Each structure stands twice: as C-alpha cells, then as structure tokens.
C-alpha cells in the first residue's frame, strides 16, 4: 500500500510540474508591452522582432529613431490570447529638415489603394503612407505639418477584430475617424454572416 501511495504521489507531483511548465510556456508569449523608447529598435528596428507581421514588412515606422527628434509618446504591444494582435504607436516632433526628409521617405512608400477600412471615413492629420488589409487591420503614418510632428500607428489582428482594447492605449486623436475594430464591429458582423451563409 505504501508503495502505491509513493507512486501516486510522484505521478501527482510530476503532473503538477508539467501543468506549471505548460502554463509558463503559454503565458510567456501571450503579452509583450513596452513604452521604453530605448527598446524601439528591438521591437521595430530592421531586425526587430515585430518588424514583420502577417507577411507585411512594416517600413512605415522608421527603422531607427533620429537623434534630433523629441519623442512625445511610444507604445508597442504584442498580445496573443489565441491569435496574434499587434498595437503600436510612435509620436515625435522634429526640425524642419528632418521633417522634410521623413515626409519624402513616407511619400515614396507604395500605399494600399483601399484606405478606408472598418468604418474609417478620414484621418485626423495628413495621411503620408498606409498599409491596410480588411482581415488584419492597418499600419499608417500621419503628418502634423503645423507642428513638424509625425504619428505612426499599427493596428494588426486576426478575424476582423482586435483583441487589444486599442482605445485604452492609443489616444483618439491618432485613430482614423470612424474606425471600429472592436469585437462587435459592423464589418466583422457582416463578414461572419457571409461566412456562415456559405
């Protein structure tokens, strides 16, 4: 009897360790967030771990932060509860020469033809470059010419909605006007209806 209790105790212990390791493995890649601009290149630099998502190489965001700019805000979040979601934004002001150089770089990017997705009717500042996909979201850069300021935003996700509550992280003034990628958004509702009709 003692031998059976020992064997069961060892099995129970190993089972708990296995479950703990499984949870640790799953949780470690579920959430990755930074607001530390010193980590920018680690996340979005040329070799950044989130420079390419869903087959889209993010050349809209700069590869490096120019030395002569004043970063106003930065946030990057990777979240993967079941499917990956990416949220990022960078806001900086710069001198007129840097502004003109970056404006030209962005203007030379071949943007998506369809820019108004998920209810978007316009953008709050001049749109310089944009990648959109009606399934996975958008990446775009805005120019606030009055203040020599650039705003870069990434909102990428799966299944026609963003698991990240993006409105809690990105100020509304940087989001497309009318944009709705919440779980119950009208575009997702329509796409799911069409999917289930087939």
Predicted feature locations:
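Prokaryotic Sec-type signal peptides and long signal-anchor helices
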Residues: 16-17, 65, 103
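Generic low-complexity, intrinsically disordered sequence content enriched
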Residues: 5, 12, 25-26, 48, ...
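Extracytoplasmic electrostatic interaction patches
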Residues: 102-198
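Residue-level signal for well-ordered alpha-helical segments
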Residues: 7, 46, 51, 118-120
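Aromatic-residue detector
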Residues: 1, 6, 40, 57, ...
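Alpha-helix initiation/capping motif
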Residues: 2, 77, 144-145
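N-terminal Sec-pathway targeting helices
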Residues: 1-20
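N-terminal export/targeting and maturation segments
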Residues: 21-98
């Amino acid at each position: 009897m003692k031998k059976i209790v020992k064997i069961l105790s060892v099995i129970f212990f190993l089972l708990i360790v296995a479950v703990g390791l499984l949870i640790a493995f799953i949780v470690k890649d579920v959430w990755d967030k930074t607001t530390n601009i010193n980590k920018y290149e680690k996340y979005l630099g040329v070799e950044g771990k989130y420079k390419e998502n869903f087959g889209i190489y993010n050349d809209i965001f700069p590869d490096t932060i120019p030395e002569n700019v004043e970063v106003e805000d930065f946030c990057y979040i990777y979240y993967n509860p079941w499917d990956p979601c990416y949220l990022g934004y960078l806001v900086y002001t710069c001198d007129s020469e840097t502004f003109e150089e970056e404006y030209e770089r962005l203007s030379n990017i071949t943007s998506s033809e369809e820019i108004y997705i998920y209810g978007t009717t316009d953008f709050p500042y001049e749109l310089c470059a944009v990648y959109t996909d009606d399934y996975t979201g958008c990446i775009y850069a805005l120019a606030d010419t009055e203040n020599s300021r650039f705003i870069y935003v990434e909102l990428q996700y799966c299944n026609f909605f963003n698991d990240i509550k993006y409105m809690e992280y990105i100020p509304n003034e940087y989001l497309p006007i009318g944009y709705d990628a919440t779980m119950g958004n009208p575009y997702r509702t329509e796409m799911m209806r069409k999917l289930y009709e087939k």
